[in-house]
């Protein structure tokens, strides 16, 4: 087992070899080092690999009960794993007294588990009766800081969101599927006839509900009641929890797009009173975790290829609604792996560490 570097707290990264885990390890190298030990944990098939963490080679441990040995109060385990893995193994960490930060859906609906975006509701981290703090999905995280700031200024009454989601949200399988499909259609004239892209891509569309190259797929998640997708309903529920608006009307349409990294969202937000777009821009410019890129005359607005690899959510295209003086239209982009997951997890873990500093 990797020895502690100092007397500081332990940070265990569960799922260290996955897509988000890789981003989180890079992120740790550029943030303040508050950890005495960074412990890497992954599935047994990844055990024994050595990964660089803050310039040091660290061996990956297999996810077993023993992986959390020596952890206790003041230590944190970050889970970047599927929901079933988090549900199975998070109690092994909390049983030792450590806190858990989980980025999966396993605990997001549990009223005993706070759902936290540090820029919006950091104070909720302290109220964790199960010893667990959940992070939202990457779509909710992308818009949370902007919505939180605007809600504090104007009072949010209604929200309509369309998300345009990157392939990497489905992990490495999503990225690899999109790259494979692009290779099959690159240099062709496909896309002008019914079925030509489907024939080129074949029946294996990876984790997506249809071919993604040269296409968009208006579906993410499983089927829920009324024709909604499970992810659309999850985003609605998470937004309500984070903003503490349990009755907020929220309508979400999730669309899968052929982008590798970076979610985009088109939002229409209605508030308690009239909204001035100029003042709203100032509010967002002052909001933590948000950068405003909003000069269409100069060709400056958020795009996923620009937001990829950056910490903040990018907001732009701010417009007062033409039909409702109380509504604001705007566009947000954020790196789904970094801003939408790894950064949220690290910031939350740092908040927990600060309680014991």
Please give the residue ranges for each predicted region.
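N-terminal Rossmann-like NAD(P) cofactor-binding subdomain of oxidoreductases
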Residues: 1-206, 247-249, 313-314, 318-324, ...
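Charged docking surfaces used in two-component/phosphorelay signaling
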Residues: 77, 169-357
